[in-house]
């Protein structure tokens, strides 16, 4: 016999919420999901009226639901935000080209302006080119670093104040586990922050080993001058999928063809096992991360700017410039190694090799020339 919704008591329940265990009807599920995201936004004071906000749009379930919910809440609660879709084309044939078609449909469905910025345009290399050169061992490192800087540069060209990404509660919990397993104490303290912060913007929410430029200081601002936040910080992945399903949203569901062996996948599998035993494990891990405090003697990176492209970095050269130089020299391993390694130091001293194309100079947020399509 169908059971009634435990919230309204009148409609037939269609699902049991993974997050709370409540049996809810479709309308109540939509309401509580959207209300919880709104509460997260308000309590964290993510936006200011008049902000220009870029939604990182990949065409996947998280960013598609985020775009829909941001548009809905902006209208319902009169946030006064100017919303944009920002997509990064990594140049992955059979994956990103297809997902971008979904993003373009979302643009029409939601009526939100879209900007697309490609790796080929910015770096002179697509991910297909990079994988052909280096193989699949470290490709997530290259992609994560390049994507992060590309997002900032795309946002700057739009003249936005804020970037929001679709990282959900599962992603946050996975990141805590990854940083524990890697022994990355400095990153562990700030990896659950809803607003990206840290001396060099390292928040560890991607599969790469080095990240830079997302923000700095406790305000969430960094050398880019653009805030980043995660409105879905407490939203379970399963509930995002259910929301997309019941709303019949148009999203792309294929995983990246180059990421089957990414380190994050192992943390994800472990987390799913924990969740099957104790559904609250996801939120419990996030709260544990939030309550961690790093001892004062832990060395923190000093914020600088890249001497080559001007982007924020904790080293003389930002990680994107280091990786790009390695690719252009025909020695991509140089970019993956530590800046303190002998091979890297010798390469830096070698002025005879052509470093090839460099990244355009960082010009900051360009409000006067901001454009989207």
UniProtKB/Swiss-Prot annotation:
UniProt keyword list: Cytoplasm, RNA-binding, Transferase, tRNA processing, tRNA-binding
Main location: cytoplasm
GO MF entries: nucleotidyltransferase activity; tRNA binding
Pfam (any one): ATP_bind_3
Pathway field: tRNA modification; 5-methoxycarbonylmethyl-2-thiouridine-tRNA biosynthesis
EC class name: transferase
Superkingdom, natural source: Eukaryota
Record flagged with keyword Magnesium: no
E.C. code: 2.7.7.-
Compartment annotation: Cytoplasm
InterPro entries: CTU1-like_ATP-bd, CTU1_C, Ncs6/Tuc1/Ctu1, Rossmann-like_a/b/a_fold, TilS/TtcA_N, tRNA_thiolation_TtcA_Ctu1
GO biological process, alphabetically ordered: protein urmylation; tRNA thio-modification; tRNA wobble position uridine thiolation; tRNA wobble uridine modification
One GO CC term, this protein: cytosol
Family: Belongs to the TtcA family. CTU1/NCS6/ATPBD3 subfamily.
Its job: Plays a central role in 2-thiolation of mcm(5)S(2)U at tRNA wobble positions of tRNA(Lys), tRNA(Glu) and tRNA(Gln). Directly binds tRNAs and probably acts by catalyzing adenylation of tRNAs, an intermediate required for 2-thiolation. It is unclear whether it acts as a sulfurtransferase that transfers sulfur from thiocarboxylated URM1 onto the uridine of tRNAs at wobble position. Prior mcm(5) tRNA modification by the elongator complex is required for 2-thiolation. May also be involved in protein urmylation.
Protein name: Cytoplasmic tRNA 2-thiolation protein 1
Species: Malassezia globosa (strain ATCC MYA-4612 / CBS 7966) (Dandruff-associated fungus)
């Amino acid at each position: 016999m169908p059971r009634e919704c435990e919230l309204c008591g009148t409609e037939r329940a269609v699902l049991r919420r993974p997050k709370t265990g409540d049996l809810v009807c479709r309308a109540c599920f939509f309401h509580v999901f959207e209300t919880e995201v709104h509460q997260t936004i308000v309590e964290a004071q993510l936006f200011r009226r008049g902000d220009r906000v870029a939604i990182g749009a990949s065409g996947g379930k998280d960013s598609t639901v985020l775009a829909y919910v941001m548009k809905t809440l902006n209208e319902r609660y009169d946030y006064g935000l100017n919303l944009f879709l920002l997509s990064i084309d990594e140049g992955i044939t059979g994956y990103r080209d297809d997902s971008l078609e979904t993003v373009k449909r979302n643009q029409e469905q939601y009526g939100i302006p879209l900007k697309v910025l490609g790796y080929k345009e910015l770096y002179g290399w697509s991910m297909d080119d990079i994988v052909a050169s280096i193989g699949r061992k470290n490709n997530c490192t290259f992609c994560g670093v390049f994507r992060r800087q590309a997002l900032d540069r795309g946002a700057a060209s739009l003249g936005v104040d804020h970037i929001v990404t679709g990282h959900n509660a599962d992603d946050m919990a996975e990141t805590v586990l990854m940083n524990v397993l890697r022994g990355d104490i400095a990153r562990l303290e700030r990896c659950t922050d809803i607003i990206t912060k840290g001396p060099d913007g390292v928040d560890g929410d991607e599969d790469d080993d080095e990240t830079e430029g997302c923000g700095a200081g406790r305000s969430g601002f960094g050398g880019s001058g653009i805030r980043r936040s995660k409105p879905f910080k407490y939203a379970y992945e399963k509930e995002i999928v259910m929301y997309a399903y019941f709303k019949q949203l148009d999203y792309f569901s294929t995983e990246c063809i180059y990421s089957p062996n990414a380190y994050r996948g192992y943390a994800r599998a472990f987390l799913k096992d924990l969740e099957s035993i104790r559904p609250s494990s996801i939120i419990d891990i996030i709260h544990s991360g939030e309550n961690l405090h790093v001892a004062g003697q832990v060395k923190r990176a000093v914020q600088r700017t890249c001497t080559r492209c001007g982007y924020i970095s904790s080293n003389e050269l930002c990680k994107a410039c280091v990786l790009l130089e390695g690719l252009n020299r025909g020695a991509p391993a140089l970019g993956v190694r530590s800046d303190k390694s002998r091979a890297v130091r010798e390469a830096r001293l070698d002025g005879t090799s052509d470093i090839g194309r460099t990244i355009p100079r960082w010009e900051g947020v360009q409000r006067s020339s901001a454009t989207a399509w």
